């Protein structure tokens, strides 16, 4: 009976076959998570309805059909629709998605795969920014087809404003989605979405507003984002609206960092 020759241990350096587990590169980890989040986001019909179909229908319908007596409807409707699209993707979409991910234990399972909590949140933020970028390109093309006059400088400045709005609404969406129950989130997120759309549309088409009602309406994040985008498209900066957005964003991010949970309390 013959035996196989033994390998010469001197052929391999000591430790060659020793396990060396380590975390993946941070940038690669975040981008992989963002790609996963983006694919999941666009596979949901409700997300498509909130982020693309409804805002697009509002843009085309309110410009083509004289529902409101506006001298230049596109100048008022276009910034408003952009703000609503950001709110839909960052707030309503994320709140509902995160809430049901928590409800069914998806976030816990992702965490068990080695992705840290900050990686999950960062991936969601990058995913929303990607969605908002695609929205902006699509709605800009439709706006141009409807007769909008967009300068390169104003278009880029408005994009910066939309990214600021993305930070604000995503932080608020993560706050709601990471603290409440899934069923409550579903109803409350949609209710707030409808209220903010109504307030933003009212401000955009109203002939003039003054007094305390005007002040209160312009403190809403959706109205403030509309003001920022409208000013940016005209190559200007609406500093008071920027300040309102920063306050909302910092407040939402701070509260989300403090109270966000990756599972339901009874899990």
Q: Residue locations for each model-derived region?
A:
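Alpha-helical transmembrane segments of multipass membrane proteins
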Residues: 37, 59-60, 64, 140-145, ...
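Short hydrophobic, aromatic-rich alpha-helical segments embedded in or entering the lipid bilayer
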Residues: 2-6, 27-33, 204-242
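Transmembrane helix-loop junction
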Residues: 63-67, 100, 109, 144, ...
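Transmembrane helix segments
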Residues: 61-68, 177-219
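Alpha-helical transmembrane segments and their short interhelical loops
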Residues: 117-188, 236-246, 250-254
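Transmembrane helix-boundary elements of multi-pass transport/secretion proteins
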Residues: 19-25, 29, 33-104, 153-158, ...
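ABC-family P-loop ATPase nucleotide-binding domain
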Residues: 1-26
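Hydrophobic alpha-helical transmembrane segments of multi-pass membrane transport proteins
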Residues: 57-61, 74-146, 197
């Amino acid at each position: 009976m013959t035996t196989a020759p033994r390998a010469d241990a001197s052929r391999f350096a000591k430790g060659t076959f020793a396990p060396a587990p380590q975390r993946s590169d941070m940038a690669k980890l975040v981008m992989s998570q963002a790609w996963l989040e983006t694919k999941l986001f666009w596979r949901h019909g409700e997300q498509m309805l909130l982020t693309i179909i409804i805002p697009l229908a509002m843009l085309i319908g309110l410009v083509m059909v004289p529902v409101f007596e506006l001298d230049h409807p596109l100048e008022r409707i276009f910034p408003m629709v952009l703000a609503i699209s950001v709110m839909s993707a960052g707030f309503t979409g994320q709140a509902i998605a995160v809430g049901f991910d928590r409800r069914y234990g998806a976030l816990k399972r992702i965490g068990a795969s080695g992705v840290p909590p900050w990686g999950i949140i960062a991936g969601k933020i990058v995913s929303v920014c990607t969605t908002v970028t695609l929205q902006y390109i699509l709605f800009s093309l439709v706006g141009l087809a409807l007769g909008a006059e967009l300068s390169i400088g104003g278009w880029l400045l408005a994009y910066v404003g939309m990214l600021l709005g993305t930070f604000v609404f995503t932080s608020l969406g993560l706050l709601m989605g990471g603290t409440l129950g899934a069923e409550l989130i579903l109803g409350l997120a949609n209710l707030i979405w409808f209220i903010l759309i109504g307030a933003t549309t009212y401000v955009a088409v109203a002939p003039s507003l003054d007094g305390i009602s005007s002040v209160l309406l312009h403190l809403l994040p959706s109205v403030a984002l509309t003001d920022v985008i409208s000013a940016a498209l005209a190559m200007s900066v609406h500093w008071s609206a920027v300040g309102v957005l920063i306050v909302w964003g910092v407040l939402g991010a701070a509260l989300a960092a403090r109270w966000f949970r990756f599972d339901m309390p009874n899990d």
